[in-house]
């Protein structure tokens, strides 16, 4: 009887240990997924590019040769590429930048977000029609057309602009000026007065119905914009960006 009782106790202890190990493994897997996200997505974010600079918006009611309201612009680009190691056939339905918010406002100026504009020479123009408050969506298409908010369904580039406006007035009688971050320095602005932090969700939706989302925070502008005029940064080590299904 005593041996039978010991065997039962031993069996229960072994079962309890097995159950505990099972839940520990499940918990560890969930924690790892929460931190690292998906590891074999059909399309991968391969690069984030940031360009910080500045320009002037003309003040029309003036006799000065140059009279500008200064704006500091930060253009952020996300490059998605097809994962050649993913064996299933997939295509992009849309890529969106959602839940856009300013976590830290600059000490000076007014902040806005902009989507690409058909009226812009390049991608962006700081006009009211192109302002976004919550999200910008790029629809999947056979080819990319950024100004039409279209991205190739096999991968492409999407972007958004974060602008700090109403930073001051630049007045000059010089023959020629260059529109860049040096204008900000010329009116006495300091980097710490521009320091900001933004956050958003980057969402990838496939035509199969699968959706992935990654939360991203970014400090802006880039540190050297006041000294170099135009500051650029490319981020390819993206382990901190964790896409998860939702």
Go through each PLM region and give its residues.
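Non-catalytic macromolecular-recognition regions in eukaryotic signaling proteins
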Residues: 30-194, 205-246
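Charged, low-complexity, helix-prone segments enriched in Lys/Glu/Asp/Gln
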Residues: 9, 194-196
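Hydrophobic alpha-helical membrane-insertion segments, chiefly the h-region
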Residues: 20-31
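N-terminal Sec-pathway targeting helices
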Residues: 2-21
